[in-house]
Amino acid sequence: MKYILFILLLFISCSKNSESNSSNEDESLASETEQLSNDYYEIYLLEQLNENRGYCIDIKGSKLNADPDNGLQAHTCYSYQGEVSVDQGFDNVKIDDDEFYMPFFDVCMEAENTSASSTLKLRGCNKNEKQKFKFNNNAEIVLNDNTNLCLTVSENSREGGGGTPTHLIRDLTLDNCSTDISSRQKWGLRKAQ
């Protein structure tokens, strides 16, 4: 009986330590994520269009649970919440080197192809031509391989899955740079608002 009681107490003690360690690990990850997000910059559309919180380049999914395999979209900027979210966070130093790098997910923005209407995906950074973009003097993000193609948000928006009021989403493509649609092709770079 003493042996069974000892085993039971040992099991309970280990379970409590495991829960405590798990909780500490979760808190540590949250703290690291918060610190990292303070170093991120968001890329936002200069025109708010129909979203007063603005549109930012965003990984499809939700913050830490975003999946880079799902590609990029324009989504309500999260900076109104006080910080740049990891799924909208870019390394501004790498942007100066024509690389749109998202450090939390260790991926770079990449064009599906180098023609109009190309979609954007995320891949491991390897400096291939489809990953080289320039933030030009006209506030456009253009593909180095075809500077006539601008990063463009779609004309129509749809509701996302969260937020109050509900967040909005628009598709992102590379389209011919044009003054007719410049309100959907001009971008800025900032830390949290």
List PLM regions with ranges.
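Sec-dependent N-terminal signal peptides
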Residues: 3-12
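Extracellular glycan-recognition/adhesion modules and their associated mucin-like linkers
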Residues: 21-68, 83-115, 130-160, 181-193
